């Protein structure tokens, strides 16, 4: 599930990153594979953070893809 906050919106624009709330059992490799398969993009890096709400994944896309384009396809912006 995508996360949209002021912080994640700025990350989309400046750092070419998307944020997702993922299953607690998901690994970085699982997240990378899922994002690449679902959106047809190349993922450079995945950072995860465990929070009380669940596990957040910050996914950095390859420069040839734009995070804002993916977000607009999802109807987030």
Which role fits each region the language model picked out?
Residues 1-77:
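Contiguous, often N-terminal, cationic amphipathic patches that form binding interfaces
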